[in-house]
Design a protein with these regions (language model features):
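RNA/tRNA-interacting regions in translation and RNA-turnover enzymes
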Residues: 1-186
Length: 186
């Protein structure tokens, strides 16, 4: 890439850091709309533009706990609790681990050194586990109603489930959805 463009990208990237409006990249396009349209498109993208994404801001921290959160559908999702770090202008100390498959893939354990980032500059995620102690146990009982849990496997993705239809988490979260703006708008 030409040094002039590299200098421009560096200047813009540094300017974005000071900008109060978040930006996750840059799109260059022709300023001649007629010429740009004449270039057409590929099967997915216009030929008159090119997009560049900034590297995600990544911070190292220490995993302190996994909180298991029951949902209205019965899924029990792992939430990573870690030492607070500054990411994209906010303090972050929690991130969804999504499901049992991701837990196992990351080989998480309490005290592990992990790298975290914000996906799309918004959603905290664990990028990698630097120590991989793999010592976290999957709960055998629902953290809310204490019913025996099961692991479902759909399309190769393992999820932890509370099968109890009377689980208080399911009832409370279903009621919360019912009275929400998207529900009855109460």
């Amino acid at each position: 890439m030409d040094a002039n463009y590299q200098g421009l990208f560096y200047f813009i990237e540094k300017s974005i850091e000071k900008n109060p409006i978040p930006s996750d990249g840059l799109v260059l396009t022709y300023d001649d709309i007629k010429y740009g349209k004449s270039l057409g498109t590929t099967s997915k993208f216009p030929r008159d533009s090119i997009a560049f994404k900034w590297k995600d801001e990544v911070r190292e921290t220490v995993l302190r706990e996994i909180e298991w959160s029951a949902s209205r559908t019965g899924l029990i999702n792992p939430i990573a609790i870690f030492d607070p770090v500054e990411l994209e202008g906010t303090t972050v100390s929690r991130a969804s681990v999504h499901n049992v498959s991701v837990m196992r893939e990351l080989k998480l354990g309490i005290g592990d050194r992990i790298n975290v980032y914000k996906a799309n500059m918004i959603i905290p995620q664990i990028r990698e586990n630097l120590t991989c102690s793999n010592s976290i146990q999957i709960p055998e009982n629902c953290p809310v109603c204490q019913s025996k849990t099961r692991i479902d496997n759909e399309n190769g993705v393992e999820t932890l489930v509370c099968p109890n239809p009377e689980c208080q988490a399911k009832q409370i979260k279903s009621f919360t959805l019912f009275v929400s703006r998207d529900g009855m708008n109460i």
